[in-house]
Structures are given as C-alpha cells and as structure tokens.
Design a protein with these regions (language model features):
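Mobile amphipathic helical/loop "lid" adjacent to a hydrophobic cofactor/ligand pocket
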Residues: 126, 137-142
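Post-cleavage N-terminal segment of exported redox proteins
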Residues: 2-56, 114, 132, 141-219, ...
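Extracellular low-complexity, Gly/Ser/Thr-rich intrinsically disordered linkers
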Residues: 289-347
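Amphipathic, soluble alpha/beta structural segments
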Residues: 150-168, 249-253, 257-258, 305-326
C-alpha cells in the first residue's frame, strides 16, 4: 500500500509545482507594445511567449550578456549596437573564433511585424532567430545548455528568470523566449518622417520632393518623375516582408533565398530590409558593398544588373526604367537622400529601455 501513497504524493507535488508556476506566470505584468496605428496590427507574438515586463527586462539583460558566448566576451549587442540602430557599422562581423560572418548584420528595428528572419529568411519567428547566432560556431559559438548552466551559477539570473517564468530554472528555451520578448519591443516610430505623418513637422522643399520621388512610379512617356522605391519599401514601416533580387550582380555571388528553398527562381533574392534609421546603418546590402547612401541611390538609378531572377520592379521593360536606369538628376538624388535622412529616429538610439543595463 505504500507505492500508491508515494505515487499520489508525487502527483500532488507536481500539480502544486505547476500551479505555482501558473500563478507566478499570471503575476508577471503583461506588456502591450506601443506603436502608431498607421503601422498596422499585423504583429507576431507567439501564444506561448506573451510580452511581460519581467520577460522583456530579462531579455534586455541577456541581450547585453557576454556569458552567452563561448569566450565570455561577445554579446548580441556586439553586432547590434543601439547607437547604430542595432547594427555594427561593418560589412561583416567577427565572431568568437575570429572568423567573419557571411553577411551584413541587419537592423533590429520593428521586428514585431516580421515572420521570416535573416537575409535569406531561414528562421521563422524571433525565438528561432535568436538561437542561430548564439550557437553558430563562427558567431557566439556556445550550446544553449552551456549558456544556461553558466547563467544558473550566477547570483542574479535565477531570480530574474523566476520573475519572468515562475521558477529559477534556466533553460535554453527560456533564454530564447526572453531575448525574443526584448527584441519585439525595439520599435522605431518617432523619426522626423513620423512627425510629418502626425502633422507636427513641416518638411523642407527638398524633403517633400524626396517623399514624392520615393512613392512615385516614374513614367517617361508622361514625364512623371519618380524613384519607385515604394514597391519594396512601401508603407510607413518602409519594408515589405518579401524577397527580391535587387540587381547587384548579373551572376549572384551569394544565392540568397535559394540556399533555403532550393528553388532556382530564388537565386540572388534577399529579404527587403527596413529603411528606418538607414542613415545610421551603413554599410548597405547583404554584403555591405555600399558605404554611402549616395552609392545606394546611384546603384538603383543607373547600375542595375540584369539577371533571370531580377525583381520585376527593376526590369527594363517597366515604364520609366530606361534600360534599368531611373534617370534621376543630381538634384533629385539629393532630395531622395534628404527624405531617407528623415527616417532617422534619435529617440530610438537613445532610449534607456533598450540600453546596456550593465553600464
């Protein structure tokens, strides 16, 4: 008769533990992301990882925690620096083994609206995205289990995990969830352009012409001037969750999306990056080949390379595309760049909620 009593006791203990975790989880304060209505509500927050104040705060600590790397010297912020709109100013970043990454570090602004991450879209969801740099041998180079063991031995992290998840047990899954929560709060929505949309800023003549060029399709037949940027970078968030070959090479040196899908039609296609804070995130493109906005505009204006998978919006059979040339004047290019500078959000790069908590 002893065994049933023991089993019953174990079951009751487990139920009590689960109940305590549930109550503690409910005690964590829900956090509603703050963003303008014109951003739209097509956001992505998994049901099993809701935003909470405690989870986001834990994620902030983890984002700047060097113990998550094999050499205890590299954190997520190593490649994603707040003052650079969470990029690092390099064409390719250096990991724990001194090896350069294969592609340019992307900005982390406004990830709340994204489902497929990295230039090639390999990761679905921020939780899956976070695991890649943490465990990649050429980036942070450490198994999640090892990272969890290191954090479990610290003085402060067990308590932080307990507040966020109900118990002090640290696991790789919880590390990923906390990081994802923090990164979903990195919202940039107070640029000069946002102030213009809200009616609190009056653009200069150059900025206004830049806005018009950005959102207008050119048509040589009707003498309509435009840069047609909005096909890929339309809407107030300045990106669409699509993959395009933007004419960098006639024969792509990097297969891009095709490395994931295995489809030849995806060769040379990469995820459309946000233009938010674009003036702060040089160098540009997946390989960091352009160091200035002037070089980027020149590329789209007159250096598009034809290839079988070139985006339909850049092909030379489109109205206004004069043999893959937009034909913007020097003055128009300056005005377009003036608009791109309007997308800089000074409050985003100085917001203490996103800053290094160890300083």
């Amino acid at each position: 008769m002893k065994r049933p009593i023991v089993y019953t006791g174990c079951i009751l203990f487990m139920v009590a533990c689960l109940s305590a975790m549930s109550v503690h989880r409910q005690m964590a304060k829900p956090l509603k992301p703050d963003y303008p209505s014109y951003f739209g509500n097509r956001i992505f927050i998994p049901a099993d990882n809701p935003l909470t104040e405690e989870g986001v705060q834990l994620g902030r600590f983890l984002f700047y925690e060097t113990k998550l790397s094999a050499n205890n010297r590299i954190s997520c912020a190593h490649c994603h620096q707040q003052e650079r709109a969470f990029t690092d100013g390099l064409a390719f970043s250096t990991g724990v083994d001194g090896t350069l990454t294969m592609r340019n570090s992307m900005s982390l602004a406004n990830l709340l609206w994204i489902r497929n991450f990295f230039w090639d879209g390999r990761a679905q969801g921020l939780e899956a995205q976070a695991q890649v740099p943490l465990t990649d041998t050429h980036e942070m180079g450490q198994p999640l289990a090892t990272a969890a063991e290191k954090l479990q031995k610290t003085k402060n992290y067990p308590a932080l995990f307990s507040k966020a998840f109900g118990t002090p047990v640290i696991t790789g899954d919880r590390i990923l969830k906390a990081l994802a929560q923090f990164e979903r709060t990195l919202i940039s929505a107070n640029s000069t352009y946002d102030q213009y949309l809200r009616g609190s800023y009056h653009p200069t003549a150059a900025e206004l012409n830049g806005i018009n060029l950005f959102f207008t399709n050119p048509n040589a037949a009707t003498n309509v001037r435009g840069a047609a940027c909005a096909h890929c970078h339309g809407g107030p968030k300045t990106f669409s969750e699509l993959f395009h070959n933007n004419g960098l090479d006639s024969v792509p040196k990097d297969d891009g999306r095709a490395t994931i899908t295995g489809q030849s039609i995806d060769k040379g296609r990469f995820r459309v990056a946000t233009l938010r804070n674009i003036a702060l995130t040089a160098p540009y493109m997946h390989d960091g080949r352009f160091t200035t906005l002037e070089a980027v505009v020149d590329h789209y204006n007159e250096h598009i390379q034809q290839s079988p998978t070139l985006s339909v919006f850049l092909q030379n059979n489109q109205p206004g595309m004069r043999g893959s040339q937009l034909g913007l004047t020097a003055s128009e290019k300056k005005d377009l760049i003036a608009f791109l500078h309007m997308l800089t959000d000074s409050s985003f790069i100085t917001d203490q909620r996103f800053s290094n908590p160890f300083k």
